[in-house]
Amino acid sequence: MQKILSKPEYERRVAETRDARMAWWRDARFGMFVHFGAHTLLGRNEWVMALENWQIKDYEDVARQFRPEPGCTRQWAKLAAEAGMKYMVLTTRHHEGFSLWDSKVNPYNAVAHSGGFDIVKEFVESCHEFGLRVGFYFSLMDWHHPDSWRCAFDPEARARFQAFLTGMLKELLGGDYGKIDILWYDVSRPMESHEGWGSLQMNQMVRGLQPDIIINNRSKLDEDFSTPEEHLTAAEGKDWEACMTFNRISWGYLDSAQAGPYSYNSQGILRMLNTVCEAGGNLLLNIGPMPDGSVPPEAVEPLQTTGRWLKAYGDAAVYGRLTPCTVKRASGVGRFSQRGNKVYFWQFIQSPQLIFGGFETKLKAIRLLPGGTPIPFEQNSRQIVVTPPPAEQCDQIANITVFEMEFEDTPVQNRCSAYPQLHVGEVLVE
């Protein structure tokens, strides 16, 4: 039996390999989350079983009808690649306890219970076809297993439930599905500690099966990255990934005709992507496929447009090793991302003149992307004044034009005061 490491020793070993394991993820910046399961059939949020007080037997009858069309995962992966995403994360099992693979540990699954196919297997194959990294979402909370609530107070139930979870993780990560890049835990209830879940033992086993895997922070251990949900807030001193719903209402499928007005357009997606780039994070944007597995129509055009924009500007302003942005709100019509001494201004609102306040570092050049056309500018101690090119030369994909600003060194910005009376001549008084 493998010796279980102490928490400090385990975390030390994980930290030693983190940079190598996470290099691709830090460069990727943008991924697709997919929430899919028996809840999809009801179309009233992925928490429908709990929110509506469904009895287990009645919900099992719903799950028995879950038979998406073979090939649906290929639609998801194709769209993710078209959108400029670099990885995908699928809910292999959500809180309802229903597994999307042919599990021998959990017969309540898409094959044995519903007579369908191994969705996880097809998902992995689809990701590989389109050059995407593979992530598995795995809910610790379970509304179906009889020990999933008893485990909080009954040691024997806890041992059985831990064995149940561990058995499923071995099925998913033990080699049948090949190399898996991300394990995305969720909702560690009802137990409130890593000791209760046996997370040290569980995650040590996971890393033994998949040495290069990266793991999120939702098993009561910090692991590799933090996961702000429905907000774009950086985790200080840590890698982080903001997971966001597409319609700001539900992770699971909702009626498209009604969800459409609440959903993001391409500008909204790119605005989120800029925020995570500016703060050094990743964006995991969700779709909730329809009952047959097809992509909800309100997601298609915005994601495809986002992908066309990223094809033009992504290599400069999004992908790869960006640096924490030293530029804060130097303009009211756009925001920034940064790579060393090069700052990328994302212009969200077109204007006949651009003025950037507070830069102390000398600006060498401004170029219009993607072609790199030089743009004239003037710089004094308070401002950089730019005359943008005509509208027909600016971005025609999503109306978000990107300018590359190259400085002599990493730019230093003295933020403009909110009180103009503090400005004395050419001197900005703090």
Feature-to-residue mapping (PLM):
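Mature catalytic domains of secreted/periplasmic carbohydrate-active enzymes
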Residues: 1-430
